[in-house]
């Protein structure tokens, strides 16, 4: 009984194995000799990955489609297309000639490159704006600005406003005194025996009072 079961198992396993057919003769191939090398059958890509033909990779893998967004001035004419092969698929890769890679690194105290593990927790970033002195719109330093023309005509405090008006009309070494105003300005009356003061160019003189006879 055991031998019958064993024979049936061997027979079933022999029938389940695929048979190799010789395309020239059309008969099943015999066992190869020890010196003969059996050629391996070539498998098609669709047999290994049958689902790759169902995925539209040409629409998903569009390399360089976002590069014109960074440089719209170049347009489609400024981009160079390079063909590449991705298995059974073909596509085009767009490269901008004026785009260069940017490498950002942080230097240590001795000028050595630091890895991400050696970087300090609180990174310090220094920003600034450099303006050329001859660039239009640049602000010169305070020491080189020179005297402004508005300083001479500037507004002075109340106590110095009168002194400025007097100093503009004076010359060094000559000081003039304001003339004596009339008595009406001071609300004073001249006595009967005195004369009013007479105005002169060099000052004021007062005549002696007339003696009554």
Swiss-Prot record:
Biased composition (Low complexity): 169-180
Subcellular location: Secreted
Biased composition regions of type Polar residues, renumbered to the chain: 33-43
Signal peptide coordinates: 1-16
The entry's keywords: Biomineralization, Cell adhesion, Glycoprotein, Secreted, Signal
GO CC terms, sorted: basement membrane; cell-cell junction; extracellular matrix; extracellular region
InterPro entries noted in UniProt: Amelotin
Annotated tissue distribution: Specifically expressed in maturation-stage ameloblasts.
Region feature Disordered, mapped onto this chain: 22-43, 162-213
Secreted as UniProt keyword: yes
UniProt similarity note: Belongs to the amelotin family.
Protein name as annotated: Amelotin
